Amino acid sequence: MKKLIFTLIITCFFIVPQAQILNPVTFNYSVVKKGADLYEAHVKAMIDSKWHIYSVSNPDGGAQATEIKFNDGKTVGAIKETGKLKTTFEKEFGVNQKYYENSVDFVQLVKLKQGNKKITGTITYMVCNDRQCLPPKDVEFKIKM
């Protein structure tokens, strides 16, 4: 009886399909000193083939726009995006979606208090391909000087 139960458990383990965790975006972080207490924080998204990530300026009513919140210091000006921006009208949402494929570099000026040696924050983003969209995801980051 024990052998039968053991065999059933092992069989179920190998037969039950394992859920595949999709993670089509990886982030790299860097910082460039621009002044005594002024830094340029770079959050670079590397996007897998056939996937795209939405712009920080993606319109309301569409997919989740990328948001980057900085916990340390004070942001100076608006976040900039460096990459090949694409715009497509999505009839499901009724808006022009703005997104990037392959890669995008989000750049934000941050003024830090004297002695602060790190920039931390959270990225909220959503990715889609031609068949599916993944739910919005939060990623915490820490950039050391």
Q: Where do the model's predicted regions map?
A:
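Extracellular/lumen-exposed scaffold segments
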Residues: 20-145
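Sec-dependent N-terminal signal peptides
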Residues: 4-16
